[in-house]
Amino acid sequence: MPWFKNLIKISKTITNQSSSYKSITPLASPLLAQFLQFTKQYSTNDHVVGLEATKSDQKPRIVVLGSGWAGCRLMKDIDTNIYDVVCVSPRNHMVFTPLLASTCVGTLEFRSVAEPIGRIQPAVSTQPASYFFLANCNAIDFDNHMIQCQTVTEGVETLEPWKFNVSYDKLVIASGAHALTFGIKGVNEHATFLREVHHAQEIRRKLLLNLMLSDVPGVSEEEKRRLLHCVVVGGGPTGVEFSGELSDFILKDVHQRYAHVKDYIHVTLIEANEILSSFDDRLRVYATNQLTKSGVRLVRGLVQHVQPDKIILSDGTNVPYGLLVWSTGVGPSPFVNSLDIPKAKGRIGIDEWLRVPSVQDVYSIGDCSGFLESTGRQVLPALAQVAERQGKYLASLLNKVGKEGGGHANCAQNINLGDPFVYKHLGSMATIGRYKALVDLRESKEAKGVSLAGFTSFFVWRSAYLTRVVSWRNKIYVLINWLTTLVFGRDISRI
């Protein structure tokens, strides 16, 4: 984009010059002049470029931090006739996480589970005052309605990251959560998580590389067994689904295409307690039996230390591995921890209308937020359906506020917000491989409801997620991938 090139050029040339708003008004357009405002707050240099506060005759600006389920659903439903939208995120797409495990073994292509932000909300690509910024938010000045960001330039060796500020009328913090490591030494250095597309790409590369290397002359029997030992830590839905996909891949594809090493590859799933603890007891027993039949070894234990080639359990057992996937749940990110606002179990504290009550014009949704104790509500689980429904509700609320003239900063105090957010759990689903899945339609663990397992559940699982895929483009991608995998097998190319 031309304006972005101008931003890069200007940010480099003004470091040692005295600048003001007047010095940039002759540039490309009034809009560019608005964007290239110089502020001295937060900056380690003399100046920081950024978006200035909106004026009363302009549309109010909503700034969304994050591009996950919550933030993307909000951006999809927000009325861009009322608001300008600015999204700040280190990734330019939304990940359809329920199908991410399928991409690790070639059942689906990576593009099938990634939806570009510009397709979810076209305004950020087409409207003159709406933007997507590839950046991280480092700090928030709640008093002055401003965020400090730093660009993500990873992979561009010729460009150093720089800071910029964005003023907001309404701020929505939907920055998600980070994988929990429980402070275990070696996890971040040696394990692979499964939360992003690049995680799935890394898992696939490692898996296929280990398969090919183990087939090369000169590799000892012991080293073959280590290279082809896939260890999954965490018995939640993600860990179980990945184990199921991996066992399918081994039984159907490795046995055909890597016949020389098929007897060496195996999967171990390590969980401290019961797998799928939120599911019905009968479904857990069924999943345990099916995974065992598929060759997945279930181990109950606690990881104490992770080394480059093995993990050490709390009882002293050494478990060699060639691929280690870590899926033990999520917790607050360093960014959320850095915010000086009330928290709820480590998350950003919100009220019944998803507002951050300690500051003006700030909302929080998704995995990074939780109801304050004063609301009398429990902190909701970190689930996609929770985040998506919060995004839908908040978009409706902000559209209502904007229509009633409360879109600008500090203008919504006297507006009736209507009914508070209410969450009703629709159930849980998980695939366990071999065309079998679990469907638990209970509203809670203690409630009664329908529980299904087997091929029928697998059909329900696939149908449900196919309908939930964001765009028709990706729906078609997913359907075609499933059909080609069924007919021709999984893609085992290492690119």
Curated annotation (Swiss-Prot):
Question: Motif Microbody targeting signal: which ranges?
Answer: 486-495
Instruction: Report keywords, A-Z.
Output: FAD, Flavoprotein, Membrane, Mitochondrion, Mitochondrion inner membrane, NAD, NADP, Oxidoreductase, Peroxisome, Transit peptide
Q: Where along the chain is FAD bound?
A: 61-91
Q: Which GO terms describe its molecular function?
A: NADH:ubiquinone reductase (non-electrogenic) activity; NADPH dehydrogenase activity; oxidoreductase activity
Catalytically driven reaction(s): a quinone + NADH + H(+) = a quinol + NAD(+); a ubiquinone + NADH + H(+) = a ubiquinol + NAD(+)
Q: Where does NAD(+) bind?
A: 228-264
Q: What is this protein called?
A: Internal alternative NAD(P)H-ubiquinone oxidoreductase A1, mitochondrial
